[in-house]
């Protein structure tokens, strides 16, 4: 009998702090048993994609660079857009490979935290990231006004 759901994790998961990824920065990540790459484009938008270039498999998070809204693979310079599409190939700049895509992980930033959506089949979010401070109005909405239970993480989140 096939169950109508997966036993694998599905939902929004905190994957870091907003302050950890500056504009133009590329970071390797490992979550959900997958290598990922996080980058903040030149406009300040944060993106998370599958970590390996579809050209020859280099990990984009190790040495990759941001060019506009794309992340560039350090191996041969292929560029991948925030929608996962191949946008540029150095030796054929007018003809990117539109058949190749990287998996895109939807990302939200809330109160200095970075959350990524994971669903094993790659489906889009089934619900929005809840705003816990609005859900529980008796608590202050200032992120500096609440107690962080792990002091070693608090120092990483400071501005």
Regions found by a protein language model. Give the residues of each.
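Short cysteine-rich clusters marking metal-coordination/redox-active sites
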Residues: 53, 73
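A glycine-rich beta-to-alpha transition motif near the start of alpha/beta enzyme domains, typified by
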Residues: 50
């Amino acid at each position: 009998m096939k169950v109508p759901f997966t036993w694998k994790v599905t939902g929004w998961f905190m994957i870091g702090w907003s302050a950890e990824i500056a504009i133009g920065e590329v970071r390797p990540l490992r979550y959900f048993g997958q290598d990922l790459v996080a980058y903040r484009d030149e406009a300040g938008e944060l993106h998370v994609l599958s970590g390996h270039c579809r050209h020859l498999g280099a990990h984009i998070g190790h040495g990759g660079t941001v060019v506009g809204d794309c992340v560039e693979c350090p191996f041969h310079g292929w560029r991948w857009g925030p929608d996962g599409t191949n946008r540029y190939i150095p030796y054929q700049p007018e003809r990117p490979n539109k058949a190749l895509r990287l998996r895109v992980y939807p990302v939200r930033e809330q109160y200095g935290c970075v959350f990524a959506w994971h669903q094993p089949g790659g489906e889009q979010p089934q619900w929005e990231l809840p705003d816990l401070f609005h859900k529980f109005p008796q608590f202050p909405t200032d992120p500096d006004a609440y107690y962080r239970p792990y002091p070693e993480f608090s120092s990483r989140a400071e501005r």
